[in-house]
Amino acid sequence: NVHEGRVLVETARRTQRIVQHGTQSRSMSNWAKVAEVVRSGHYGPLKVARGLCYKRRGSIGFKPTGKPPAGLDFNMWLGPAPEQDYHANLVHYNWHWFWDFGNGDLGNQGVHQMDIARWGISNATLPKSVVSAGGRLGYKDQGQTANTQVCVFDFGETQLVFEVRGLVPRNEITDLFHFE
């Protein structure tokens, strides 16, 4: 959330505090080395950087509407989201699967692998275009966000392809680089 990020920076300046924000992989020296080697051209021109988030996610089912638990200010929880009835799937951990609060595994776990894949692309700023297709497949529940999704980011000479698969026999969270 860009607005919340700006508020965080303003608060840090006002209170003279140090704030660190980012994806966890940026603090891991092994990924920094991988990105550096990929960008160096040692293996040739990078054509495709792929990020994979194959992480089994079961159905969240259906939770009945009711009163929020004591201690939860549900109005504050909603923030700028539309007013709606409380049910237990809207809060931890399942909030990721509702468009008003999250964007599925793309922004939950996937953002970490997407960041690494993008890190390997020299001079990547904003993509020229993005195409994405997916859906919530395999079960009926209250969730809204895609559990299966493919995104293609066009950075010109290099494409970033990112996949989310929530219906897999085993977890696989990784990145792949394809060279000319």
Task: Annotate each PLM feature.
Residues 1-27, 41:
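Beta-strand-loop-alpha-helix segment that lines the small-molecule cofactor/substrate pocket
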Residues 13, 37-40, 65-68:
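Short, hinge-like loop/turn segments at secondary-structure boundaries
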Residues 19-22, 38, 49-51, 61:
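Alpha/beta-hydrolase
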Residues 27-28, 138:
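Acidic-and-aromatic substrate-binding clefts and catalytic sites of carbohydrate-active enzymes
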Residues 33, 45, 50-103, 108-180:
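Contiguous beta-strand/loop segments that form the cofactor/metal-binding neighborhood of enzyme cores
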